[in-house]
Amino acid sequence: MSQNKYWQSFGEVNDPENLKNLSQDEFQEELPFEGFDDKGLIDAKAPRRDFLKYLGFSTAAATLAASCKIPVKKAIPYANKPENLVPGVAKFYATTYVQDGDVVPVLAKVRDGRPIKIEGNKLANNSFAQGGTSARAQASVLDLYDMYRAKFPLHKVKDKFEEVPTFEQFDKLVGDAMKAAGGSVVLLTSTIVSPSTKEIIAKFPNLKHVQYDAVSYSGMILANEASGFGKRIPSYNFSAAKVIVSLGADFLGTWLSPVEFAKGYSKGRKIDEKNPSMSKHYQFESFLSMTGSNADERFTHRPSETGAIAVALLAELGGAVAPSIADAKMVASIKKVAADLKANNGAAMVVSGSNDKNVQIIVNAINNAIGAYGTTIDWTRPVNYRQGIDSEFAQLVADMEAGSVGTIMIHGANPAYNHYDADKFKAALKKVKLRVSFSEKMDETAELCEYIIPNHHYLESWGDAEPKTGIVSFQQPTIYPLFKTRPFQTSLLRWAGDTKDYE
């Protein structure tokens, strides 16, 4: 054990007793007010001399503080003032927030050339977000000024990233490496909702495109295909539903398109002359959610009972054999909900948050039985977000493990962080000869890549989005790119041999 002794000052070494006394008496003089603690400041008594002393000190301090002027900051005018710019007066630009499959038409508030606030665009197409916005969209302006953004193209040399001075040099490095890698070329992205981007991807020679979503809706897509509706997700009209039944779908919080659903849901919950009755909302779930907390009636169950409850509900509607459920209260609740669905045939809907294909097939059968299709659920205008298929991503990982993938380019996806088997993905990714990332930040997946060419932030970009078939929203830049970044679409064009720019 160490025998070293430590002191805070020389006084503690030379004269510890005196130092102790001095420290105890440092604030020995008490306030010269009698009865301050009991009577308060108004009734306190103090000697005239002490009163004048403290009054003089406070007056002098106030005079001194007032005489200290705040440093003058001079505003330097523009040498060439931008057109239609008034210093201090904000302007608004309509654009579209697109990230990880989420799509929200927004208005960006720009002051002195800098975006400072994001709001919903009430002038956008009323059949989608209807002027709503989300917490993620509101916070996205902070990403623009994030000090950890990738500021220029990077190339990993001996486990250390180095800056590539020009885009031309970067394109040559990647082009040469792509030829040397051989094998198949794969583009891994989150769901792409941009029609123009899809065209560019389709023109890239011998490119395999795999879409991956951190929150998967693969079970729903495959169930819809098995039910004869095609490999797609329908539009849900919550405003037209008099009865809403949710089987674990947090449609006001995170499920599919909560901004759009919250707007429709709120319309059905308001009572006025045109709508004298309010919609009824039943929620079956295993944990409390934003949607569950707003339900008229909420029923809790174990996560393992989700499928049984869906089958029991279908059985009450005459479409299946009722399963055995031990909870008598739950059985009674299911009967009550089924009766309400029957009474509102054609004006009800059932949604499920399960990613189990079989559960979603049962939910489709329930909606068919209550006449939801064509009224509250619309197949004529399917959505284009959340299109990732789990089996396609699993096949990609298997191909990487087998060494058949020569080049992989990754945009808007971070499976090394948010995939349930991230370690397996990391090990497979390391077997790919050429790994390129378009990430705006050095995330867990980008760290494993050899080349990084950061994409523009959406507030710096031109672009388009089609969240639903026939509904298009556009992106426009609200600020000049802050760093040496480039649209990932332009990179694809360059590496495909096209000299055009995306923007």
Segments (PLM) and residue ranges:
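Non-catalytic alpha/beta scaffold blocks inside enzyme catalytic domains
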Residues: P165-Q169, A180-A181, P205-N206, Y212-E503
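N-terminal export/assembly segments and adjacent metallocofactor-ligating motifs
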Residues: M1-A328
